[in-house]
Amino acid sequence: MHVKKGDKVVVITGKDKGKQGTVLEAYPKKSRVLVEGVNMVKKHAKPSQDNPQGGILNQEAPIHSSNVMLVDPKTGERTRVGYKEENGKKVRVAKKSGEIIK
């Protein structure tokens, strides 16, 4: 998968198109990512020890990884991700600027 936890991404399609956020979690087997502040859904929660009031909560839902693009750390624009070997290790590279993605 081209994005990992902690990456800054921009949504390129769907109801949240244009929104930016960081990846909170990645689910590689399902090719989905959880992005901060994107794809908010209402969850109905029963009263519990943690939440004695219960009620309706707003939380993020996962979106498909093909609907997000990485934000280039150098230019701040969205970019595709490439891979190259450096010191015997496979590293991710921003296609627009050639910057190595940490």
UniProtKB/Swiss-Prot annotation:
InterPro entries: KOW, Rib_uL2_dom2, Ribosomal_uL24, Ribosomal_uL24_CS, Ribosomal_uL24_KOW, Translation_prot_SH3-like_sf. Signal peptide: none annotated. The keyword Protein biosynthesis does not apply. Gene3D superfamilies: 2.30.30.30. GO terms for molecular function: rRNA binding; structural constituent of ribosome. GO terms for cellular component: ribonucleoprotein complex; ribosome. GO terms for biological process: translation. Residues 44-65 are annotated as: Disordered. It comes from the Bacteria. Keywords: Ribonucleoprotein, Ribosomal protein, RNA-binding, rRNA-binding. One of two assembly initiator proteins, it binds directly to the 5'-end of the 23S rRNA, where it nucleates assembly of the 50S subunit. One of the proteins that surrounds the polypeptide exit tunnel on the outside of the subunit. Belongs to the universal ribosomal protein uL24 family. Part of the 50S ribosomal subunit. NCBIfam families: rplX_bact. This is Large ribosomal subunit protein uL24. It comes from Shouchella clausii (strain KSM-K16) (Alkalihalobacillus clausii). The lineage of its organism: Bacteria, Bacillati, Bacillota, Bacilli, Bacillales.
